[in-house]
Amino acid sequence: MAIFHYTVKIVGRSKGKSVISASAYLNGDVMKNEETGRISYYTSKKEVVYTRLMMCENAPPEWQIVPEENIKRFQKSVRYKRSEDKEAALEKFKITFQKQRLWNEVLKIEKNADAQLGRSFEFALPKEWNRQEQIQYTTDYIQKTFVDRGMCADWSIHDKGDGNPHVHLLLTMRPFNPDHSWGKKEVKDWDFLRDKNGNIVIDESHPNWWQDKKNPDRHGIRIPVLDENGIQKMGARNRLQWKRVLTDANGWNNPKNCELWRSEWAKVCNEHLPLHNQVDHRSYEKQGKLQIPTIHEGADARKIEQKFLAGQEIKGSWKVAENQ
């Protein structure tokens, strides 16, 4: 039976997360963080069965060039010489090199201590699909949902052969300009008056009503900046001052996106699954089911449980549980 699992997280500096390490993990490879000099090793992860980098239209084309000297150096390595399929090994090296370049470029532009570096996804693949179908349907979904909208996608398929094939995906969070330079994540806009539900109040008769002449859909009641006497402040050239806020420049951080992305993936799954085996991205509550959702354990939790059940020596918390 097909299952639906789809999680989205942010890889950011504030939590001490490394986007280089995250990429190395999902690719099961070695990557170097040029900012810190640290190297992340995940070559022991044998479950990586497919990996790919999909660059958006405005991304710098030179980031996909792998210097000949790097290729020659890799071909002299023990890893290359021991590989059974040298052509496949070289191809994976090139892809990993390109991904390493992408995320190191992200680190160069995202310098703030609280900077968001990448958006991380993990979602299940129906085990009813064969490998080629998994690759094709996932590629189409990522291209249409993310890459066509200006994001670069670093992704791979993990499959241990235990009936749980899944995708790890890492997306860039800053757009590119048409000239291939980095764009802005946020722009300043008027802080419009909103109701208790967070919606912009519409009242064209209000004295502070404002509407963009070039974009009529951009409108609202502006909020004045007041001094200690409750009088609206004046700025340069005696212009009235209005409150401004930073807003998402491209809409990628809209909280509603997560539900949209989940529903689009569910649609892809159901288009390629029989009617009796459809998936539903909605929560049990929204489906009207009186059922307690399961909790995603993760690999580490399963390993601990296996040790506990096997009676191996473990930490005190598990020993207490064993004696209850």
For the regions a language model picked out, list residue spans one by one.
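N-terminal nicking endonuclease/strand-transfer module with a His-rich metal-binding environment
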Residues: 1-324
